[in-house]
Amino acid sequence: MAYYGKCIETVIEQLDKFTPKRDNPEQFLEAAATSLQALSPQKQSFVLEVLSGCLEYRKLLTVVVDAFYVEDGRLCLRVDHSRFEVICYLATFLLEELGFQLFCNIIKSQPVDKMCKFLRFFFNPLHLCSWIKDEWSLIYEPAHVKENWIDPLMRWQPEVQELINHLEGVSASQSSPLKTKAKVTEPKEFNLTAPRPRTIPAPEPVPVVAKPRPVPQSTYQPPKEQQQLETVKRYNRRKAEELLLRANIEELRCAMPRSCRERVQGSKQQLRLQFPPRIRKTPKLTFYRPDNILVKLNTTAILREGALYQRQVEQELQRVDKLVDGAGDFSEFFEWQKKMQAKDREEQLAASECRRLQGKLSHEEAVLARQSLMQENKQRVEQQKEQMAKLMLQRAERRLREDRSRKELVEQVIEGQKNAKAAQTKLAKGRQQTVQEAIEESRGLLQRRAQAAQEEQRRRCELISQLRALETQPTRKGKLVDLTQIPGYGLEGEMSIVELRERLALLKENQRRKEEEKRDQIIQGKHTKSQELQNMVEQISLCRAAMGRSAALRWEEKKALAAAPAAPSQDERVQQLRRRISERAAERSRQAALLHVSAPRTARPKPRAQLEAQHWLELERSRERRLQALQQGGSGPGPARRLEAA
């Protein structure tokens, strides 16, 4: 029994490895034959015969085993699927060839409970004559099924039933253990008066706490960086106040006209002597270091900024020279400048108002477009519903045509399966012949490769022997050379090696001397350039201070202009945009009323639209207030504006 059990286990193991979707049966059998070469010839032939039969009649066996799992084998594992297929194949195709006694030995070598369930299900006369016969007749001819498979199974059914009864008796005798008398439970009374003594808890160990670090004194003191920032802020504010006071005192001194009849001699020198310098260094304070440059500039930035400030200084000096030489009064120019600035400011306000009104107009047009889009969407939805109904009808017709074509295809497949066995036999013979030819061709290739490898090995041995013979020959290792002797090849400028070395040493010395001189020149040039850059940085700092004062004056002037109220604009473009906005709003209200009438479900209030309308109204009011403030502030010019114009 152990012998047959090992054979059946080998077949089951090989069947578990087979995957119908991925593996080819012929190739799988060849691979299995190569893996089973370690077995004896008799055992190998039996395993391969059963394995090939299970693969060939896999459809028939799968029908029976799947039905067994559905009805009687619900509690059986899916791992035993291949085991049931092998038993079904042996009972159907090899029972007469093996003999009933050998079949009984094979059945007894397997698990008894599983075999009893499966054989009772498979050899049930009701199952064999009804659905098993019908299912097998769908795959093969009904006459062939009844004559070769169903009738032999029905003849063997009584003997198999005796085998099943015998196996059930054996399993019942093995599984019935000796029944022992159960021990009676003896109840015990509860002892409620004697409480359990309380356990004394173990003392907890006192944790050892590390000594904490003292709080640093810097925690209770303000940081040094904050103190330094406060110091710098106070110094900068004091310096700005001094510069503003000095600018207000010396205001418009350079713009005073002189008589044209007075002759000017040395205008630049007289100006420098007559007027004090506009920019003076403030005295050093004890709490601030003015040499601390906050921004580090590279050479290119310093030169560029220095050239810019130099051009500005030259232009300012030229303008002062023209004024000193007798230029006219600037009152007319100031009046014209004020008018042009007021006109430019009004144009800017009108342009900003136009932009705001255009935004509001685009909003109204967007609302109109959204309403028209809603109407178009309703029409499009109705069209899509009609198209969907047509598509559903077409789909139903297409399904009917597909069902008819599928039935025709099933009939064609059934007819093609009748000739499948002959085609498979022919295909197997062709594949065996192809494999034999490939094996012979590979043998020839291996022989040719072995001959080529032997020839290559022989050639390498000859080369190695020749190299070893060359290595054994004596060679002259040294050569006598006179370094002071001229070779005498007849070349121009020919010299000995000693002379060549001396000349090379002299050339290196000259080159080193030239490099040192060039290095000294570079260092001197860098020093000069750094000094010039330092002077230019000081000049740039002075010019920046002057520019800062002028920027502060312009900022004060802009603040004064922004704080003044402005009058409402009367521009034609603004009026036209307002009229268009009112027309669009009226049109939008008319369309909304039409939509409310046509679709009563959408007549509920829209809080989002109300919020948008309120937002636009508040934005328009704030814009009008700002325009009034700006226009009222443009009428009153100050001394700072005249200074900027000069």
UniProtKB/Swiss-Prot annotation:
Lineage: Eukaryota, Metazoa, Chordata, Craniata, Vertebrata
Alphabetical keyword list: Cell projection, Cilium, Coiled coil, Flagellum
Compositionally biased region (Polar residues): 217-227
InterPro entries: CFAP99 (IPR039341)
Coiled-coil zones: 368-459, 494-522
One cellular-component annotation, GO: motile cilium
Region annotated Disordered, chain positions: 195-227, 627-646
Subcellular location: Cell projection, Cilium, Flagellum
Domain of life the protein comes from: Eukaryota
Family: Belongs to the CFAP99 family.
Protein's UniProt name: Cilia- and flagella-associated protein 99
